[in-house]
Amino acid sequence: MRLQDKVAIVTGAGSGIGLATTLLFAREGARLVLNDIDQQGLETLLTDVGKEKGRAVVGDVALEETARSLAQEAVSAFGHIDVLVNNAGVFFDKDITDMTVEEWERLMDVNLKSMFLCCKHVIPHMLRQKKGAIVNLASINSFIGMELEGVSTFAYCITKAGALQLTKSLTTRYAAEGIRANCVCPAFIETNVLKHRGTPQWVAELWRAAGAALPIGRPGQPEEVANAILFLASDEASFVTGCPLLVDGGYLAR
């Protein structure tokens, strides 16, 4: 097992990429401290994982108290922290002229500030053991702006560019202290993020069009991103740090 006896924190664990990552980590032997704002979903997931292998911290990870509690729970329950997966994220389909200040701040808080807060409270524990792995969820939008059919991504792109630069800054600061920091950069992963954006037919057509835009010819699945996260979190990636790992079906190779 690639994460046998390692302790991993996963934010946004209740759905999508976070859910797929949690289930994969559990199969690979990790002990888990899971966060989501959805209490019911997190409790169901904890049942699937097994309470002997998992703990749950329900709350808004954009709040410092939640990030602090995640680190404290991991150390209290399992003694140390080996892996941090900063996965929590939100998406607002608003153009710059329509987005409210509150929506802008919420995007920045969940997609970027939460990464800062979790790193702030986890890194001291990793420094004491002189080892750790951080995996941030970035995006192809860390590199490019993008407008889909009727979907504005401008503010989301800004947060993901920040996630990439956070990863690079963590690398230059902490690589010599045994802490690796990497990010995965997915494109068009078929989750429920757009479920309430339009009719089921509209959503299905959007995913079809997204898949057609990729050289591989289809959208990705959360499990495919989880596999990349597992690699970066594992000792197999012991010489990999500062890496933006593309999981994009060839999109940026065009």
Residue ranges and their predicted role:
Residues 95-96, 103-108, 134, 206, ...:
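Substrate-binding pocket helix/loop in short-chain dehydrogenase/reductase
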Residues 124, 168, 172-176, 238:
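Alpha-helical segment proximal to the catalytic Tyr-Lys
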Residues 85, 175, 180, 240-242:
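Short, small/polar-rich loop/turn modules that mediate ligand/substrate recognition or access, typified
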Residues 144, 230, 241-254:
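Short C-terminal tail/terminal secondary-structure segment
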Residues 119, 159, 167:
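Active-site helix of classical SDR
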Residues 3-32:
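Canonical Rossmann dinucleotide-binding motif of NAD(H)/NADP(H)-dependent dehydrogenases/reductases
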Residues 139:
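Residue(s) in the substrate-gating loop at a strand-loop-helix junction
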